[in-house]
Amino acid sequence: YASYHHNIIAHCESRVPRLGPRYTTLALDKGELVDIRNNVYYNYAGEGCYGGEAQKVNLVNNYYKPGPATKLFTGSKEKRQYRIAKPDVYPKDYSGADYKKWLQTWGRFYVSGNCVEGYSDVTADNWQDGVFGQMDAKNCEGGESSALWKEHTSIKVNSPVSGAGHVTTHSAVDAYDMVLQYAGACNYRDKLDELIISDVRKGVATCTGSAKEWESLKGWSDNKPGYINKPSDIGTNAGQLDEKGFPVLATDTEICTEDTDSDGIPDYW
């Protein structure tokens, strides 16, 4: 069982998130159970959220906010702007021998309460365009005429595949506000954290790196808005970051760092 909640993923090319099964957990009595709720996804591109081959997944009350990179999708790919998830199957010729038992097998998905900013119809009905409309028969043996593809709507279940444990569930809109206010790996936010949160709130991409040095490679394309190659692509952000793109941290020179017993912890601690 895996739980992923109240996190933010911003300026990420793809795998937002990638629902990637593991054969050892697929083999458990109840299968691989994944609960994803109350997260915020901003300025995603590539494939966005996809996968879930043979998994059992809850996608509940997440907030999707297309950004400048997301909005570059046009034509047949425009639907990725309002993608909630693209469930799929492992192809018959998948190279992972340990996954043989689960090839050509749909997962089961409980999808409810997700909000896609700017797409009220998808917010109202997550399934029609946000999930079913994103799927294709590419990995189905026999394509669209196969029995496997004809049963692709069977991925939908009407009750959660698992409970949420001790997670408090909020509406997607409330989760958006809470995640932007509280999410993070520390109890305070540095200038880089603040920059990312500001981008999400404003719907912008402040920093974009250049991929020109790789333009001789096959399939090359320059970075989409908001995507960087290295920390220094962020710049100094008006002097709030150093030249390498990292926060400028204060140094306390008054603390004695003597460690008389050599246990790696200063005596004062």
Question: How would you name each of these model-derived features?
Answer:
Residues 15-16, 47-49, 71, 81-83:
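Structural detector of coil-to-beta-strand junctions
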Residues 20, 39, 49-50, 85-88, ...:
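Secretory-pathway low-complexity, repetitive Gly/Ala/Ser/Pro-rich segments with frequent Tyr
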Residues 60, 64-262, 266-269:
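Long, contiguous C-terminal flanking segments immediately downstream of a protein's structured core
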Residues 46-47, 267:
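Alpha-solenoid ARM/HEAT helical repeat scaffolds used for protein-protein interactions
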Residues 1-19, 24-26, 30-45, 56-68, ...:
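Right-handed parallel beta-helix
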